[in-house]
Amino acid sequence: MTTITITRPDDWHIHLRDGAQLKDTVRDISRYMGRAIVMPNLVPPAIDTETALTYYDRIKAQVPAGSQFEPLMVLYLTDKTSPDEIRKAKASGKIVAAKLYPAGATTNSDSGVTDLKNIYPALEAMQEVGMLFLVHGEVTDSSIDIFDRERVFIENILSKIVADFPELKIVLEHITTKDAVDFVTQASDNVAATITAHHLLYNRNHMLAGGIRPHFYCLPILKRNTHQQALLAAAASGSKKFFLGTDSAPHAKDKKEAACGCAGSYTAHAAIELYAEAFESVNALDKLEAFASFNGPDFYNLPRNADTITLVKKSWDVPATYPLGDTNVVPIRAGEAIDWQVE
């Protein structure tokens, strides 16, 4: 039987939600992830240090006994985020980054940034204190085709931020295009990217051909196969600029299977197993550990995890749903098999 032992991985982008759902999301992600960058797009969002730290406490209260899982918190940037708030967040020791949501770009982004110039003072403070800048890289102009919004964001917005803040560490999150791969590859060492398992395993045909499959609908949206192949090549390249970020984003079954369904795919139930499938598909299992366990902490200037996990090449069937608070979530690969499992 094929087995792989790797340093315990981390998830550098996840949505844990809040309230009754928190118990279930934390249960799933803490099974073998050491740490996770927790997105702040709650209702209301974590726009200040106090809100982010009380959210940290709620997450920690749900970590199962015996797990060493540690949430890494993120500040939600708004037009009014002050340099003093950035310094206060950094001094907390638990908030490691601040997140740009262009207003209206994704779930619970209505409080986001309307004009980048509004956050330039905050970005200057982040550059000064060494706080990372996380970016949802899509424009929100309704005249821009949804499949082009990442590329246009990179061309019109991100390139300028990188030029204006050369010492700021920037993570372009959940990249979905060859354009993003090329930009990150060619940028300075201060620019990196996360890649999801579902963008490595699937493209827009899986979502749209032969019927609409709403559980593949996420933002940024799945792109064509050529972009999927570029993502696989980047993840398996050995480059230190790319690392694991699931963007696991649960929504209740009825919120996905609806006339106007929510954006987000749930992968926390089997994150590293799905990544193993993706890396195996391009004969690059030897590159999985760096992508999942080394590149993220190295970029964040945090220690790598000291312990290991073992993956076994053994098929198992994913349940049709998992509990999510007082409802259920349909996970990626629901009712189908996954080729790997954690021993």
Curated annotation (Swiss-Prot):
The active site is at D247. Pathway: Pyrimidine metabolism; UMP biosynthesis via de novo pathway; (S)-dihydroorotate from bicarbonate: step 3/3. Its cofactor is Zn(2+). Catalyzes the reversible cyclization of carbamoyl aspartate to dihydroorotate. Substrate binds at H15, L16, R17, N41, H136, L219, H251, A263. Belongs to the metallo-dependent hydrolases superfamily. DHOase family. Class II DHOase subfamily. Zn(2+) 2 binds at K99, H136, H174. Binds 2 Zn(2+) ions per subunit. Pfam families: Amidohydro_1. The modification N6-carboxylysine is found at K99. This is Dihydroorotase. Homodimer. One of its GO terms (cellular component) is cytosol. One of its GO terms (molecular function) is zinc ion binding. Keywords: Hydrolase, Metal-binding, Pyrimidine biosynthesis, Zinc. Gene3D superfamilies: Metal-dependent hydrolases. The keyword Methyltransferase does not apply. GO terms for biological process: 'de novo' pyrimidine nucleobase biosynthetic process; 'de novo' UMP biosynthetic process.
